[in-house]
Amino acid sequence: MSNAIKVSNPSRLCLFGEHQDYLGLEVVAVAINLRFSAEVTPRDDSIIRIKIRDEKLDTLNVENTEGLYQEYLTDISKEIVYDSDEDFMRSTINVLLKKGYQLSGFDIKMDSEIPIGKGMCSSSTMVVAIVKALLEGIGHPDAKDPYKIAQIAFDAEVAEFGHPGGMMDQYASALGGLINLKFANGTEAFPIKRSLPGAFILFDSLERKDTLNVLAASKIPTLEGLEILKEYGVKGIDHLAFGGADVSLVDKLDDFRRKKVLANIDNYKILKKGIELLNQSGDIDEELGALIYAHHKNLRDGLGISTATIEKILDCAIANGAYGGKINGSGGGGCCYVYAPRECAEKIIEEILKD
């Protein structure tokens, strides 16, 4: 298969700004060494055939040794009909066509080191890989533009179906590295040029997430609360956190919406402290871990997206030397991570596996 084109892109951890990208706020994300890969081979017909690692392989550290794949066929000469509102492979093809890209037939074989449905942006990373693979396949210059790839991926995964997600996952995967993403005026990415000497340790709770319902339960009441507060001149979470708006106005909300809005205000303040910290020199590990865990506590207590299993993992890790940690992704299950001294990593893993 000498004419095959290979592409890959990483998953990410969200350090700060979880559940805030869809509010038009900032996030800090870091790419990790779990990747989605695609191998693209041209065909002589109008069929795009995607073979993707079987969704049964949905846990960390499971290799596709038996070659288990699911296959999806799309004839681009015909109208594309979605099987569901999560038919992201066909929506990616359809969005590219609607944007005017001249696609042709391809075989695309996809593999992933990323567990599916666990808060590791597997669907976003997959869509980014498909977009890049198809653009590379047709030799389009946009294949070299990570911003363009990320926007197309967002349109295919979120906008096409009216889903409630934000843009962090697509941009973090397409751009990679340690980055501060801002969404207030379009999308801006600011690389953070520093190394982090500690170890990020990722854990799978083995609990399957219901991403759309979790997002709806956290995003919708926050937006509803902010809409109510507009009547009092409040322009958004950033206005309440740093812009001079009277925070006591939040008391005009019912308890449910009030709790969501207050958690987002505090998490925005934590994000700003985190960005300032990451741009400092010197040893920041302990303070960084504490801020990450403070962020998690707002996600747990304010947005209600943690689980008993994830709390048990984080408690055990911190008791055995981790600086801090948090749930990763939309929540309600899936993965969490801790930031820890490298010399403590093995012990932390051993103790959690005991439980």
List the predicted regions and their residue ranges.
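A generic structural signal for short coil/turn motifs at secondary-structure boundaries
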Residues: 24-26, 116-120, 209-213, 300-301
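FabD-like malonyl-/acyl-CoA
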Residues: 125, 336-339
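Glycine-rich phosphate-binding loops that contact phosphosugars or nucleotide phosphates
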Residues: 333
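Structural signature of FAD isoalloxazine-binding scaffolds in flavoprotein oxidoreductases
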Residues: 24-44
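C-terminal nucleotide
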Residues: 2-16, 37-86, 95-98, 102, ...
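Short acidic-hydrophobic sequence patches enriched in Asp/Glu that either
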Residues: 30, 126, 145-149, 163, ...
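Gly/Ser-rich oxyanion-binding loop with an adjacent helix/lid
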Residues: 1-13, 21-22, 82-194, 319, ...
